[in-house]
A protein has these predicted regions:
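Structured surface interface patches that mediate subunit assembly and partner/cofactor docking
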Residues: 14-26, 39, 43, 47-50, ...
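Short helix/strand-bridging catalytic loops that position acidic/His residues to coordinate divalent metals
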Residues: 29
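Alpha-helical bundle segments that constitute or directly flank the non-heme di-iron/ferroxidase center
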Residues: 2-18
Length: 154
């Protein structure tokens, strides 16, 4: 999962104009990173940060690494990139028995990007949505929309 998530961030960085594509397919990553996990994550965060630092949020559309959604308004694209990172952070956290890093506030901020990109990717990058529950906060509702069970634990 970490190699996939890091590869996604490198892909976003490359498409918005800074950085290079990962040397592997993020959807078929190698079993282990070339360096440490910390080096892998640090490099992905640095690449994404450097790329987005060069993008003016009011600049119009930017290219994306999402074939069904080849361009998005810059603000939506940045949020879609952040959505990818945040959801994979949730995946890793819950799979390793750690608390969710996805707050209701962050989920609410990322929800518009999810609504802009998820449906064309449904079945490939996202599972079918799960039914929401009356007690769901923004984080649980977003996870269910993305096909993830917010109650899942390792």
């Amino acid at each position: 999962m970490l190699l996939h998530a890091a590869g996604d961030q490198h892909a976003w960085a490359s498409f918005v104009g800074a950085g290079s594509l990962p040397t592997y397919n993020p959807f078929d990553p190698p079993a282990r990173p070339e360096g440490t996990v910390t080096e892998l994550v640090d490099a992905a965060v640095a690449a994404a940060t450097a790329a987005w630092d060069q993008v003016d949020p009011a600049s119009g559309s930017v290219p994306t690494p999402l074939p069904p959604v080849p361009t998005l308004p810059a603000e939506v694209a940045a949020a879609a990139c952040a959505l990818d990172a945040a959801i994979h952070a949730w995946d890793v956290a819950v799979a390793t028995g750690q608390p969710s890093p996805l707050s209701d506030e962050l989920a609410a901020a990322l929800d518009p990007a999810a609504r802009a990109v998820v449906e064309p990717l449904r079945g490939f990058a996202y599972a079918a949505p799960l039914a929401t529950e009356a007690t769901d906060g923004a984080a649980a509702a977003l996870l269910r929309y993305l096909g993830r069970d917010p109650e899942w634990a390792a």
